[in-house]
Amino acid sequence: LRLVGSEMCIRDRDIGNKYAVTGLARLFYRRIGEHYNKFEQWTFPPSVATATMNRFVKDADLDVLYYRRITNAKVQNKRIQSITLEDSQKPDKKTLIQVKAKQFIDCSYEGDLMAKAGVSYFVGREGNEEYDETLNGVQMSFWHQFPDGVDPYLKEGDPNSGLCWGIQPNTLKERGSGDKLVQAYNFRLCLTDNKENQRPFEKPENYDPAKYELLARAIRKMDLHIDNYLLFNWGMMPDNKYDVNNRGPLSTDMIGMNYEYPDGNYATRERIWQEHVDYTKGLLYFLTHDERVPSKLRDQVSRFGWAKDEFVDNDNFPTQLYVREARRLNGEYIMTQKNCQGEETCLLYTSPSPRDGATS
């Protein structure tokens, strides 16, 4: 629900053959199809995904604890005996509850249960030598690059004036080397060009136009416009809606501003989360209102707005930050590049029985 109900509603299946999708996942896409009077449907807006997931919960008669987050895990003899949860909206001792079970499964983005249980993990990107890989670690990417000639200084041509927002003065490490940095986060947006179901992009309370100076300079250097996908990745959905993702040198990804998130406490994560909200809303306001943006581009972006019937309890804004990566479990078997390229296959092994209370 956290994934499809808030963000990934179109393209991130990342498979070449839909017949590889089976089980409950296949049933999910076929139930989405029922909504559109089709056999199955692979693209869909968040509201339809949420309703479909809630149907699964209702059919299974599950008790779901919403807005709860872990504060502690009691472990004995390498087995989780119980976990303590607090109400994320009212985090005090009065809201604490304890949950006991034979098995606990951490299906979260962040892996907080894993960390609280003392399981070893890694944050960042391993170097090539760690698992004899070639595509991990520091890499130079062809995509999402600035054009030549974009000045990085606050006052163009003056190194003494300081760097524009978003630029870090660090030296790029050797290709293939490891570090503790994580892939950028963003919000996957649900926008529409249907004027009858649309809210305009409004100026956010903490709007700072300086955060988009580099984008303004890139626009001057390139013929950046909305149709050729140089600003956003547009995924078409039913009902004149679009799943909007990052693309280009400066887009919806808030690059370099999430490094504290994986191991951060809840207050740190909340700060980072809100910074991403402000940045994203500010980006769309900038593109539709700032005079540094050519009128042609402003008009193109202004065709779109927030879908009024999506995320109705959250100002029509996504409820989930796209945490692309955080903690990585150091498990009995670790998937590597060789697995992805078909050079190695994980052999089956006997794991501890769920009845023993093993963690997953």
What name fits each language-model region?
Residues 91-103, 107-351, 355, 360:
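Flavin (FAD/FMN)-binding glycine-rich loop and adjacent Rossmann-like elements that form
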Residues 3-12, 349-354:
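Conserved small/polar residues in nucleotide/adenosyl-binding loops
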Residues 6-7, 11-72, 76, 122, ...:
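Conserved N-terminal/central alpha/beta ligand/cofactor-binding core
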Residues 1, 55, 112:
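Surface-exposed charge patches
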Residues 4, 78, 99-102:
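Structured loop/turn residues at beta-strand edges in well-structured enzyme cores
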Residues 11, 80-81, 136-140:
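Short low-complexity, flexible loop/linker segments enriched in glycine and/or proline
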Residues 76-97:
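Conserved beta-strand-loop-beta-strand element in the redox core of flavoprotein oxidoreductases
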